[in-house]
Amino acid sequence: MESFLNSINQKKIKSEFPMTNNIYDITKNGERLNIEFKETLNRGYHLKKERRQQLASQMKYRMELGDGEAVYFIGVHDDGHLIGLSSEDFEETLFVLKSLAEEVNAEVLDVEKHPAEHGTVGKVLIGRSHDPKNEHLLVGVAGHVDHGKSTLVGTLTTGTLDTGSGGTRIFLDVQKHEIERGLSADLSFAVYGFCNEKVVHLKNPLNNREKSRIVEKCEKVVSFVDTVGHEPWLRTTIRGIVGQKLNYGLLVVDASTGPTHITKEHLGIILAMEMPVIVAVTKIDTATNDRVFEVKDEVFKLLKLVGRIPYMVKSLEDADFVAENMNQHIVPVLKVSAVTGDGLKLLDELFLRLKIPSKEEDLKKPFMMYVDRIYSVTGVGTVVSGTVRQGKVRKGDKVLVGPDATGEFMEVGVKSIEMHHYKKDSGEAGEVVGISITRAKMEDLRRGMVVCNDNYPARAVREFEAEVAILVHPTTIKDGYECITHIETIAETVIFKPLDKEYLSAGDNGRIRMKFKYRPCCIHEGQKLIFREGRSKGFGTVTKIIK
């Protein structure tokens, strides 16, 4: 019994019937509003399917009357008479209540015990869970500048058609210079969801409370990471694709322009990360039917060239089929317009049906997240954000952040956790969260650090080996060559030393010893990496940690 009570969140919640009121004064007036009496419950009967559904519906009704809270008195007869329960029956009844609460996305918040004629009477406060049980799909959006990435996402998440001027991109490009120039300069994040298999749009996408409600209410939440299409900011695009633990890539191609060198570059990054990809041929309202067909054909040829199987999605049945069978090899292609709305319902259907990889194994591992952004919030303090790679972090946890330039990790506390402005008690693998931390200043932190539990095997690595493929290089890569290398959210200058031969050229594969030039980073075997500097580019996998 004590072990169960110790697992309950002990914080007090404001209620019309506070937990400190005299229990007899409340029960003598009978059941009403959010108050329910239960003499005893047992899992053998009350958790059978039909009875469980009835009791879950009853609990949901009581919570609605209590503005999200219900008060259950256990060991109490329907007429309000205090009977009491043995310790075994008390614990069994609590177990059933907890199981029912999980059915309606709620949790047991507090328990009081009071003496009665034949044992103990309990007063149990049940409230909405701060960790809604929903599926979370993370989609990275890539493509050339002006091909309509932000406009498509803005229209998709709001249901508001664009006028043709790209106005819906304002829902994502929130910096003044981005709005004025119509160009995204950093990663942007957007969200929408599905309830009862119906799309839920944001009526006011700039309202943080509305984003919060999407996370709270929807059974499936789709988060978009909108990357940058302008070539000078390619590093930011790489960070968006490599550093966010994405489930799928959405590659956007203008129906008039067709695939460009940037389109091919972004596709290459997505494929290097071994990520399933969807292609949206956008702005079909601005091109002739013949040109749309030509661009579709160009996209198909490009996908086949890199060993993928394009699949044209023309109907809801096609969307259902490809979602059921999609993998790294099959690439659905859709024709869409943010102005006319053509193809948007097919995209909705695809995102609704797409499978989310199981994170069961990741949840068993110690918590770890790579830092993507660092900022200070008035009244909150220092916040780090990123995608949780594995495990689960809870409010109140002690975690490590690092490594710093000397290779050390510092201990900090987790004050609060948010996902799309929705306050949560925890964050888990696959979720994009902001974590408010104590005892750390912004100047002590940098992008590419990890936040992790003390039982995660965090280590400051200076040198490692990788198996790489050189895609493009104007000359040869020799000992001492330097290049920016991306691993997760890390973007650091690395010194190369070929191991199998004296030098590597474009088209070569080989082992390379790499050394972070300025500071150590926390990496491990098996991680994907991309390097790009000037006209040089390649990708690979970390195979061995040296030190």
Identify the meaning behind each predicted range:
Residues M1-P132:
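Polybasic/polar functional segments that serve as interface/processing modules
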Residues R32, A70, Q244-Y248, M273-V277, ...:
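Short glycine-/polar-rich loops that comprise or flank the Walker A/P-loop
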Residues I83-G84, G119, C195, P232, ...:
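Switch/connector loops and helix/strand junctions flanking conserved nucleotide-binding motifs
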Residues N134-L234, Q244, G249:
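P-loop NTPase switch module centered on the Walker A-proximal segment
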Residues L138-D146, S150, G154-T158, K301-A458, ...:
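Conserved catalytic-core segments of large NTP-driven translation/proteostasis enzymes
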Residues L138-V141, T288, K441-K547:
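C-terminal effector modules of nucleic-acid-centric enzymes and ribosome-associated factors
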Residues K220-S223, T227-L234, Q244-E265, E274-E294:
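Conserved Switch II/interswitch segment of TRAFAC-class P-loop GTPases
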Residues T282, S337, G534:
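Active-site glycine-centered loops adjacent to acidic/histidine catalytic or metal-binding residues
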